[in-house]
Amino acid sequence: MPDQTPAPSVLRFVDRHIGPDDQAVETLLNTIGVPSLDELAAKALPDVILDRLSTDGVAPGLEHLPAAATEHEALAELRALAQSNTVAVSMIGQGYYDTLTPPVLRRNIIENPAWYTAYTPYQPEISQGRLEALLNFQTMVTDLTGLEVANASMLDEGTAAAEAMTLMHRAVRGPATRLAVDADVYPQTAAILATRAEPLGIEIVTADLRQGLPDGDFFGVIVQLPGASGVVHDWSALVEQAHERGALVAVGADLLAATMITPPGEIGADVAFGTTQRFGVPMGFGGPHAGYLAVHSKHARQLPGRLVGVSVDADGSRAYRLALQTREQHIRRDKATSNICTAQVLLAVLAAMYASYHGPDGLRGIAQRVHGHARALAAGLADAGVEVVHDSFFDTVLAHVPGRADEVRAAAKERGINVWAVDADHVSVACDEATTAEHVADVLAAFGAAPSGADFAGPAVATRTSEFLTHPAFSDYRTETSMMRYLRSLADKDIALDRSMIPLGSCTMKLNAAAEMEAITWAEFGRQHPFAPASDTPGLRRLIADLQSWLTGITGYDEISLQPNAGSQGEYAGLLAIQAYHHARGDSGRTVCLIPSSAHGTNAASAAMVGMKVVVVACRANGDVDLDDLRAKVTEHADRLSALMITYPSTHGVYEHDIADICAAVHDAGGQVYVDGANLNALVGLARPGRFGGDVSHLNLHKTFCIPHGGGGPGVGPVAVRAHLAPYLPGHPLAAELSDDHTVSAAPYGSASILPITWAYIRMMGAAGLRSATLVAIASANYIARRLDEYYPVLYTGENGMVAHECILDLRGITKATGVTVDDVAKRLADYGFHAPTMSFPVAGTLMVEPTESESLSEIDAFCDAMIAIRAEIDRVGSGEWPVDDNPLRGAPHTAESLLVEEWTHPYTREQAAYPLGKGFRPKVWPPVRRIDGAYGDRNLVCSCPPVEAFA
């Protein structure tokens, strides 16, 4: 019989996760002026949406959650789920390959909080380590593809293909609306292209492009190299033909193959896209993996997502920063190149360091071994009289076995190997870095063949003659000692959660507990192919089912898809579902999307991607949606109204008390309500968007549910819906249990291998713990608002003077009076050892602060002390004691080197620069560079590793 004895409090995970203890919570409440956390919730949230606890003290929607487990209990349950999976030898291919992650990279990147707890490098002076790693990634991609500029990762190969399509469409600027797609692209890529193309009015023409480009006008062409069938085809003639007819060409290129075969750029391709998964990143049942997108430099400004560039700091030293940010959704909104926000930075770093560790010779050697196994397989098949369909291939052999495909697949399965049955007559077998001669022999036996002593008669594919990865970054770290120290040196340049709170509003930088992270490196989860037989993955499927049940209860929705692999993709999938619902009802004219002026730019960019027209709704002076303006615009667009996108609590950091009336106004006009779940950390256990008016929401598992941000990804953005939208959730052509329509990610369940993090968090917190986390997050934000309001006015509060889980500090008056900017304050915080809050969003000239429930009272107080000390420095500028152009704020951040000059000419002391609150305040953070010149970096765009001479 199981042990029913309650766990001692010392083992309760909730007390490890939530920073303030009971005494600290009392201090928070006393400062705020409320007697209890429940009273705080009653004052902050509208009564109409606030869920009441049941008689047994459980919040509605959370009663189905199991009782909170200890860390050891949760890990034991996860281990049991993992052990129910079968780790077969995967030779399926189709874009996913087994790989050998070097232990030095697993230990020092994937398992290192200095890397996985960092945020997107918007504060470049304290992000130089991961920016350098991302520059290595971009250099790796450009070298291997033969193109000139690559971005700092995409979500996966399929979405990279879709972005390549829209990039070419923008770049051509002609009347053509047709895209030619080769029939031999991966099925999942073709499905994502179809989903993305339809609302944009793009017609996809699928054909065997080895026979040439079909008649008619095209803006672009997409081919795969090698193809899904494994064939290596010379596409140079097609590229020339496409260019003659005014079309651009994008190649889905395998980067390992590109070490041997002629790369896309050298055959004239304009764009290359793909995945870096086989560079040390586990398959993970589909993700997460870092996709890539590379172009010629003339198309650099058309690239979506993050782009790292080289600039200079205030002393003229080389420094890295995010370049050309005006392309991105947070600035250009519905005119952005993409809605991509979070990408796959952690996996991009892993792939880049895999390339650095192996170097060009090592990568070429791995590729040659993979190709050698494939040739040995083909030779054995040919000797046995089995037809090898293509004689030119890299790693994948396609065998023609009339009527025997299922028989061969079953025979391979009996030997512990999964192969790919293309149809009843063809079997595809893919070799990879983990393939051995024994695996080849076993597969041959499944065909009724045996290894051959002869080489395969097909042509050689090793046609690449150009060098690659010649920068010292890919040759200097070939020993484990040097790589370990390199990774440590990079991490030491950054501020992540292992060094400081990261109070970024709208980002929810909470604890990513070690127990939550532990399972993601287990082989039973990591070495699963997304298209493996369902019988191999019962544990993963049970985990996914648990999450679907738990998350729908928490949010009040009826169904959920875990496929979207970022919040941006969740938004996109949710809006697609709304449009599909309208179309199914004959309301195809409903294309207007109402979006408040305070919304995150991703909302508008996502609406544009599904063909909606964005109409902006005004906000009142207190930050709430202007209900009169909303009603007027609902009336004006009633017959064409598709949806309202609204973030709740609002992007202004308050619970709008009109939310029920807002939703009702849209519903009365036949529209749907999209409740952006970015701020769900302020709702869990208190209110459910699916019950107060939402028809659909996306969740950010990398915010509310503890998946780490990884320096800019991975993320997971599940989309949850009410029942009437459920038929339009994302499907997948290669998952029998899903429909074939509305595919938004390359894998059926997106970034499945990091779902154990969220599973563990919910399992260990339980219903009461989740609700407590929300309440403490709200209390901590209100405490900061109370402590700092007299120094920096809090811009918005709710009807009872409360904020939600974040607060906006208004510096506009300070800037007008003193000349000190929000940028000055953000940079100065680094001298105090803190990462800055979110700058100038959603209101220019402000700081948005979100402490989360995980930060202790002492850490919150230290942040407040730093902000108060900075206000005193501002006052010295305002009084004229320090010039506006020469003071510790304008000079921030201060490097050690900048203080070691022989003659100090500033009106403030070196001690004031480096230790403004004394040497005992907190561990010193030394920024590696001074303030970076952003304009210089955009004017002189360099997006690959600069030559060594540049640092001389």
UniProtKB/Swiss-Prot annotation:
Keywords: Oxidoreductase, Pyridoxal phosphate. The lineage of its organism: Bacteria, Bacillati, Actinomycetota, Actinomycetes, Mycobacteriales. It comes from the Bacteria. One of its GO terms (biological process) is glycine decarboxylation via glycine cleavage system. The gene is gcvP. This is Glycine dehydrogenase (decarboxylating). CDD domains: GDC-P. HAMAP family: GcvP. Signal peptide: none annotated. The modification N6-(pyridoxal phosphate)lysine is found at K703. GO terms for molecular function: glycine binding; glycine dehydrogenase (decarboxylating) activity; pyridoxal phosphate binding. Its EC number is 1.4.4.2.
